[in-house]
Amino acid sequence: MLFSESSVSNDCTYKGRKLYGRILLVSSNPDLRVRSVNSIPDLRVQTVTTVPSRCGEWQMVTSNPDLRVQIDPSFGEFTIQFVESFPGVGP
């Protein structure tokens, strides 16, 4: 599957959903399905323990998520790369 650069909007949304906040990783019934890559992602993701307020900041939670995400190794609506710093849209 090909991923376009425009799949994640510059305002850090995808199909109207913000791509930062409290994230619950699930194995079924996700709000979004993503594919994790090692380079050239649509979104760079940094896991944080504080309140996520910037694009790509994900606080992993076990309840009351803003977004339910499934990481699929072979298919995703867009690609993500986990990073230690500089989260956000694009490579």
Segments from the language model and where they lie:
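Repetitive, compositionally biased segments used for assembly/scaffolding
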Residues: 2-91
